[in-house]
A protein has these predicted regions:
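Conserved ABC ATPase "signature" region
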Residues: 108-126
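The feature captures the beta-strand-to-loop junction immediately N-terminal to the Walker
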Residues: 35-37
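Catalytic Walker B motif of ABC-type/P-loop ATPase nucleotide-binding domains
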Residues: 155-159, 164
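Conserved ABC ATPase signature
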Residues: 130-134, 138
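Helix-to-loop junction immediately C-terminal to a conserved catalytic motif
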Residues: 50
Length: 175
């Protein structure tokens, strides 16, 4: 079975269907790009895959042992996110929160993995800085590191280069 299977999905928001009859499969190792106009349901599909909202009709099934907790997510950035008053290392570590359960602290292994992800995205030198003081490109790298910490087996990116200059966008895709 495919890792992710969408069956006859109808998706919408504000009580209005924006996407109907959607069927798809995603296998391990696949890259899937969802392209469409503003308001066409791209983010709604992401939220439905993550279980943040139900489909209006149809079903999403996970196979091969994949669960929603195995999926990392880089959402569209909002003004609230841009002005978030936390250290970069805290934001990146928060990618592990879905695994913590009732445990109130991150393990040494999780802290080390967060540092590795910061290095991977070229942002290790930002770990002790306040997130809201960073440029848009730096913030996107930090959020990508956070999503990578959460992603055990799958990664969803929702408009990851919006607002970035061409060089920063190319660097983001290069990761």
């Amino acid at each position: 079975m495919a890792q992710i299977l969408g069956e006859n999905l109808t998706l919408g928001y504000d009580g209005k269907a924006v996407l109907q009859g959607l069927n798809f499969t995603v296998e391990a190792g696949d890259y899937l790009c969802i392209v469409g106009e503003n308001g066409s349901g791209k983010t709604t599909l992401m939220k439905t895959l993550l279980g943040l909202q139900p489909p209006l009709a149809g079903a999403i099934r996970f196979g091969d042992g994949l669960t929603r907790q195995d999926i990392g997510y880089l959402p569209q950035q909002t003004e609230v996110q841009r002005d978030f008053p936390a250290l970069v290392r805290e934001i990146v570590r928060s990618g592990f929160q879905g695994r913590c359960g009732l445990r109130p602290f991150y393990t040494r292994a999780e802290k080390a993995e967060a540092e590795r992800m910061l290095q991977k995205v070229g942002a290790a030198d930002l770990a002790g800085r306040c997130y809201r003081e960073l440029s848009g490109g730096q913030q996107q790298r930090v959020l990508l590191a956070r999503a990578l910490c959460a992603a055990r087996r799958a990664l969803l990116l929702d408009e990851p280069v919006t607002g970035l200059d061409p060089d920063a966008a190319a660097a983001m895709y290069g990761l």
